[in-house]
A protein has these predicted regions:
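Intrinsically disordered, low-complexity protein-interaction/activation regions
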Residues: 1-182, 186-192, 257
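Recognition helices and adjacent regulatory flanks at domain boundaries
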Residues: 163-164, 168-258
């Protein structure tokens, strides 16, 4: 089976059948998500309860937690012995083991680490970056985006996706500027205060012959950085704008070929 947490929580069987999660109460889904966020690391019952309930612990939080884990096991792996569950009882707590269930968050993290081991621009590095883009249909734990336990994995996925989009956009500028522009635009949407994606969008738009569009990307960058953060675009971005303007002027001044 495979659990997905990038975006909304989902579970599929080995044959690709999607399991309905309507029978799991919200607290049970939260328990599953916390275990997924901390996969392959045993969690004490107190730590899990603190993540799920915070200061609003039920009267007997240990019993409540045990009930929800039992419900998760019965719902997602009916008929399977507890000893074979992907949620393993260990050291008085529980652990989501990726040896018994796939997890998209773990796959993304592995792809990011593997990509970093290859040199910039290498085909294998770009293939792994593309895999990250395919996996990260959205940031993880969308139903609990403001939960403290979700903050770290959400930030990690955002950064991994930003790097993947940026590297893929940079690689495509010359060969496929339209794709490069789409990827750069996605990177800007993901982090409007990161400057390199704006530079990539400017380069891609210019490569498409859309000079005005390229300059509008600079204006968006300037608005995000100057108006909202109080800092100007970098000298590199300003120089890129100047180069685009100069090339537009040269194109306008070029003589029209005789008929």
């Amino acid at each position: 089976m495979r659990v997905t947490v990038l975006g909304r929580l989902g579970v599929t069987t080995a044959d690709g059948h999607t399991l309905p999660l309507d029978g799991l109460p919200r607290r049970a889904r939260q328990v599953l998500c916390v275990l997924a966020a901390r996969y392959d690391r045993p969690q004490s019952k107190d730590a899990l309860a603190d993540a799920v309930w915070g200061e609003d612990l039920p009267g007997n939080h240990v019993a409540a937690l045990e009930h929800y884990v039992s419900l998760i096991r019965r719902t997602l792996q009916p008929g399977r012995p507890t000893s074979e569950s992907f949620i393993v009882t260990r050291a008085g707590g529980y652990v989501f083991t990726t040896q018994r269930a796939g997890l998209d968050l773990a796959e993304l993290r592995a792809a990011a680490r593997a990509a970093d081991e290859h040199p910039a621009g290498a085909a294998d590095r770009l293939r792994l970056r593309q895999r990250i883009v395919e996996l990260a249909v959205d940031l993880p734990f969308g139903d609990d985006e403001y939960a403290e336990w979700a903050a770290a994995p959400r930030a990690e996925v955002r950064q991994a996706l930003l790097v993947a989009l940026s590297e893929l956009a940079a690689d495509a500028v010359a060969a496929d500027p339209a794709r490069s522009l789409r990827l750069a635009a996605d990177a800007v949407a993901l982090d409007p205060y990161a400057e390199p994606p704006y530079q990539l969008a400017m380069r891609a738009a210019a490569a498409l012959g859309r000079t005005d569009d390229a300059l509008r990307w600079y204006d968006r960058c300037q608005h995000a950085l100057t108006d909202e953060l109080g800092v100007p675009p970098s000298a590199e971005t300003a120089a890129l704008r100047a180069d685009i303007v100069a090339r537009r002027g040269q194109a306008a001044a070029a003589p029209t070929p005789a008929p």
